Structures are given as C-alpha cells and as structure tokens.
C-alpha cells in the first residue's frame, strides 16, 4: 500500500500538471453491490452525484492527509482518493507498464489531457466531501498528526506512541490514529536506523532510543519523498515511472542478506507482527521487553 512518501509524490505530481485545470468529463467502470449504500463512486447512485458536482469545476490544488489524496475544487468540494493496495494516478502520456494498464477511472480536462486511475485489485476509495467538512469526516477525523509537520516535535511523537504503552513498536508506529502515513515499509526502515527490535514494548524502550526513532522517522520519510516513493511492488508516479526508494532499503524485503550497518555482521530476518511482516537485524536492533 502506498505510504506517506508515495502519496506525497503523487500530490506533487498533481500540482505540477492539473492544478488550475477544469474538469470537462469523467468516466469510470467501478460498480460493486457491496457499495450500494456508501458514499463512494463504486455506488452508481453516488457516482451520479459525484459527476454532477465535479464536472465543470476547476482544480484549485492537491494536498495530502495521511495516505489520502485531497483534490480541492472551486465549488468548495474535495475529491478524496485513498489508493489502497494497488491504485495510482497517471497523467496523459504516462509510461507504459503492466501495472499502469488497469484503468477504472479518468478525468478529462479543458486542455484535452486526461488523468487516469489504475487500480489492479479495485480496492481504492474515491469519494467527494464538502471541503469545510473534511477535517471532521469519517475519512479523516480519526487520524493522528502528520510526522513531517514542523510542529511535530519529539515531545508529541513520544506522547502519541505512549498512548499504546504495552504495544509492540512496529504495530504502534503503523497505527494511523497515533501518527499518520507510516506503513510496513517505512516502519521497518525507521526501526533499523534506530536500532530497535520491532517487537519491543513501547514503555520499555529507553528515551534515547525514542529520540533515535524520531530522528530516523523524519529522515526516512523525507528520503522516501526525495527518491519519488517506493516501487518494490506496483506503485508508480503520475508519469507511470517507478520511484527509487526500494534501491535504498536497509531492512524491508532484505531477508537473508547481511546487515548494511557499519560493523554489524547480522543477517536480516523476517517475522510476523500482528499479521504484518517485519524485517530487522537481530544483532544491532535491541529487544526491549
């Protein structure tokens, strides 16, 4: 699933291509009986309302909240897209790739260009909300603070994670109600850098290591954005291109490989933590319990 860096990369791409453009038509082939009573475009009745409110509107800008893409329109409504497992947006003339061929939605603009949505497993969530009600909507109201905000300092980081004092740190880092945007990939990389075992109990981890985690979190997420996201799986940017963060993994999906930490001779292992995989070095990542 795309995490904070992949979603931010997509938002940056939207602002460089479709910001200021007017939507002139929409097409989609989502239609699921499981969404008949939901406010998503997979519900044909909601899609009819969606089209009516979106066509003819100018895109003011795109933003990110956690793993959600927010496309603000001129009529004070916002298109919310959660890409889920396999979704990604593609702008006109994108690079051809098998992962870019599962088109289930597109927007056409006043310049004749299109914005496509590829979603191989059709899990994505796409809806429309009044912009003024976004913050308190069921989609965003539960989310924790943004880890890259300037105001998100160590004190807040420490406080948020200690809301789950007996939780395993890998699981707690991925809890979207505590900190928004961190998932499987980046939690592994954060813990590798901080030297903390993924099953360490939160309230047993020394403050020194929490400070290392905080520093690692800022560095890893920024690095993820700098490298255009992670395309170990099927994520692509709006040009249809792969990100490059997967070339810089130190833990995630490196099972059986020698640890890259200087002076460490550990071998990366993989375990399951609360149904999610965790990759770590058993030599330099300390277990606190």
Set out the residue ranges of the language-model regions.
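A short, charged helix-loop
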Residues: 124-164
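Short histidine-centered catalytic/ligand-binding loop motif
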Residues: 96, 139-148, 200-207
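Basic, nucleic-acid-binding surfaces and adjacent catalytic neighborhoods in DNA/RNA-processing proteins
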Residues: 22-50, 58, 63, 159-289
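Acidic, proline/glycine-enriched N-terminal capping motif
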Residues: 1-136, 278, 282, 286-289
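Hydrophobic, well-ordered secondary-structure segments
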Residues: 102-104, 114, 137-140, 170, ...
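Catalytic cores of large soluble enzymes that bind and process phosphate-bearing ligands
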Residues: 2, 6, 149, 209
